[in-house]
UniProtKB/Swiss-Prot annotation:
<comment type="similarity">
    <text>Belongs to the ergtoxin family. Gamma-KTx 4 subfamily.</text>
</comment>
<keyword id="KW-0960">Knottin</keyword>
<feature type="disulfide bond">
    <location>
        <begin position="24"/>
        <end position="41"/>
    </location>
</feature>
<keyword id="KW-0528">Neurotoxin</keyword>
<protein>
    <recommendedName>
        <fullName>Potassium channel toxin gamma-KTx 4.10</fullName>
    </recommendedName>
</protein>
<dbReference type="Pfam" id="PF08086">
    <property type="entry name" value="Toxin_17"/>
</dbReference>
<feature type="disulfide bond">
    <location>
        <begin position="11"/>
        <end position="34"/>
    </location>
</feature>
<keyword id="KW-0964">Secreted</keyword>
<keyword id="KW-0872">Ion channel impairing toxin</keyword>
<keyword id="KW-1220">Voltage-gated potassium channel impairing toxin</keyword>
<feature type="disulfide bond">
    <location>
        <begin position="20"/>
        <end position="39"/>
    </location>
</feature>
<dbReference type="GO" id="GO:0090729">
    <property type="term" value="F:toxin activity"/>
</dbReference>
<dbReference type="InterPro" id="IPR036574">
    <property type="entry name" value="Scorpion_toxin-like_sf"/>
</dbReference>
<dbReference type="GO" id="GO:0019870">
    <property type="term" value="F:potassium channel inhibitor activity"/>
</dbReference>
<dbReference type="InterPro" id="IPR012622">
    <property type="entry name" value="Ergtoxin"/>
</dbReference>
<dbReference type="GO" id="GO:0005576">
    <property type="term" value="C:extracellular region"/>
</dbReference>
<keyword id="KW-0800">Toxin</keyword>
Amino acid sequence: DRDSCVDKSRCGKYGYYGQCDECCKKAGDRAGTCVYYKCKCNP
């Protein structure tokens, strides 16, 4: 789910992150981006 995406994500301070996207899509969201080293899912 969305929380596990954030917990597991390791990415750059800003920008697109493929694994984020995959995890977020499984959680039912459209895509994922990185904000301050954390994954954010976009509904």
